[in-house]
């Protein structure tokens, strides 16, 4: 099908860059992977998403801004590559999930350690995508990791480690795909690459 798959496992939102002597810098990545086409939108096959009225600007929470800076997602927010909110009721940074210009879901990251680390607000199984101007995708587990790579390639967050049909449909739109799951999901990453 012409889709090229490359695999190298690293945690995208930390300082680890893979095995010793192997790095993927922003400049070398841009030289290697020249965008060929704009990814297409996917069709949301789920019910309409209604954004809760507890979502406010990220700037209303210092903890939210500090979290975004720590995981290297704040620059993507400032550049307009992602649409973020703060959920005042649940104390979460909220990453809005889009299909084109339409908001179809949201994923929230807990800031206080109470409740689940990540919470999916809607019923869509769409992945979170950031940096849609590239023909190269980097598959990661969470939204923050997708934001941390979106200045170089498109970040596609699975919101977990399971590869769903909806994720595959999005990934088919890219010429090259990296899989960069956390170290504890290495076996799943290898399975994805072989799929």
Question: Where does each model-flagged region fall?
Answer:
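Single, functionally critical "micro-switch" positions that shape active/binding sites
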Residues: 1, 140, 181
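Non-catalytic accessory segments of DNA primases and related replication-initiation nucleases
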Residues: 1-77, 81, 88-92, 100, ...
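Short beta->alpha junction loops/turns
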Residues: 12, 142, 160, 182-185
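Short, surface-exposed linear patches
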Residues: 32, 77-78, 159-162, 179-180
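Phosphate-handling DNA/RNA-contact segment within nucleic-acid enzymes
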Residues: 87-176
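A structural-propensity feature for long, helix-poor, extended segments
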Residues: 173-186
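Short, intrinsically disordered, charge-balanced linker/junction segments flanking boundaries
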Residues: 192-195
């Amino acid at each position: 099908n012409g889709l090229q798959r490359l695999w190298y496992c690293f945690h995208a939102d930390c300082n680890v860059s893979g095995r010793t002597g192997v790095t993927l810098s922003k400049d070398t990545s841009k030289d290697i992977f020249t965008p060929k086409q704009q990814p297409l939108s996917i069709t949301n096959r789920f019910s309409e998403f209604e954004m809760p009225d507890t979502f406010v600007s990220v700037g209303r929470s210092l903890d939210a801004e500090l979290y975004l800076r720590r995981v290297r997602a704040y620059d993507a927010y400032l550049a307009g590559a992602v649409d973020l909110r703060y959920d005042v009721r649940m104390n979460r940074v909220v990453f809005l999930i889009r299909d084109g210009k339409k908001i179809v879901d949201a994923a929230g990251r807990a800031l206080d350690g109470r409740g689940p680390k990540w919470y999916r607000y809607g019923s869509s199984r769409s992945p979170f995508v950031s940096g849609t101007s590239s023909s190269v995708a980097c598959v990661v587990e969470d939204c923050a990791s997708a934001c941390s790579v979106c200045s170089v390639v498109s970040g596609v967050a699975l919101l977990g480690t399971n590869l769903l049909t909806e994720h595959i449909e999005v990934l088919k739109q890219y010429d090259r795909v990296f899989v960069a799951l956390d170290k504890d999901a290495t076996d799943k990453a290898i399975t994805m690459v072989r799929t």
